[in-house]
């Protein structure tokens, strides 16, 4: 299965035990890794989505537009960046539109301590 940056994918979670706010259930995620890495690596860098829309004031929480394939309104948790095996991707659900790509990129820069771009 080909996976590209900014794809919305459904991921099966292989985490052993829930721990606080760590995401560990099967859920959608956004592929953050560049396409060269996506093509050549057995792993992917992703940020998880949640349907629990909370703390929208945080710059690392990006509420998405409606996307076919997502059952509920969703928010990207850019403080929940994870490296997963490509084998954990069940399917590609959709792809972010340009407006949401900009929001996710800004939230990721803030999450990693690089600031925000205009």
Residue spans for each PLM region:
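Conserved functional hotspots at enzyme active or ligand-binding sites that engage polyanionic ligands
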Residues: 1-118
